Design a protein with these regions (language model features):
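Repeated polar recognition positions within modular binding domains
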Residues: 1, 27, 87-89
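Short beta-strand segments at enzyme active-site cores
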Residues: 1, 53, 83-84
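N-terminal binding-site loop/beta-alpha segment at the start of enzyme catalytic domains
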Residues: 1-19, 136-137
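Glycine/small-residue-rich loop that forms an oxyanion/phosphate-binding "nest" at active or ligand-binding sites
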Residues: 10, 26-73
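Short loop/turn motifs at secondary-structure junctions
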Residues: 15, 47-50, 78, 102
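Extended hydrophobic secondary-structure segments that form protein cores and membrane-embedded regions
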Residues: 21-24
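Beta/alpha (TIM)-barrel catalytic core signal, keyed to glycine-rich beta->alpha loops juxtaposed to Asp/Glu
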Residues: 58-190
Length: 190
């Protein structure tokens, strides 16, 4: 969706600096040269001089080479921050100890049913931001009707989604909730 995002930002009339743009290097582009090429392609599709955050999608393939490409682009100012996603503690520790610039962000599935407390502590030890992918558990396990979340929400006049987001934020986890509904977007900020 990089082309569409780039076009939308350009057409919005809002200064580029007001947006925080994240992209990922996919497994199919792993390895130093291929990853670097894909970063340049992302910049071109987005019609931008820099990307705020670039992540490795998963720890498969030559992810060390991929990370070296991201470090290079970071040093060149093409990326403002670099990190990983779906790196559980063992893989995270491994890469954090053997790269020049440790990951600044690790995006991993995190929600009230899968809190990733051990992973969080590991990231914290490396000054890495823990970013939640799927803070609503993708709606699984009847998430929005969960009895505990609903009860807490009633107490504070909030939705179960708001309760779940608040829990993560209070525990120093960055959240990226997904919705296409304007009213839910507004609720997610409340």
């Amino acid at each position: 969706n990089e082309e569409a995002v780039g076009n939308a930002i350009r057409k919005s009339g809002i200064p580029r600096e007001e947006f925080f743009v994240t992209s990922k290097v996919w497994i199919s582009n792993s390895g130093e040269e291929q990853a670097y090429k894909s970063i340049l392609e992302s910049l071109e599709k987005l019609q931008m001089d820099y990307i705020d955050l670039m992540l490795i999608h998963q720890p498969f393939g030559d992810y060390y080479g991929t990370y070296r490409a991201m470090e290079r682009a970071y040093k060149e100012g093409k990326l403002k921050a670099i990190g990983v996603s779906n790196f559980y503690p063992d893989r995270f520790i491994d890469i954090a100890n053997f790269v020049e610039i440790p990951p600044m962000v690790n995006q991993v599935e995190t929600h009230v049913f899968q809190q990733q407390k051990k992973a969080h502590e590991v990231m914290k030890g490396y000054n890495c931001i823990h970013e939640s992918w799927g803070p609503f558990a993708e709606g699984r396990k009847d998430f929005f009707n969960n009895e505990t979340l609903v009860e807490i929400g009633k107490k504070y006049n909030k939705t179960s989604a708001q309760v779940a987001l608040r829990y993560l934020i209070q525990n120093d986890v960055v959240v990226i909730p997904k919705t296409v509904h304007k009213d839910r977007m507004i609720q997610n900020f409340d």
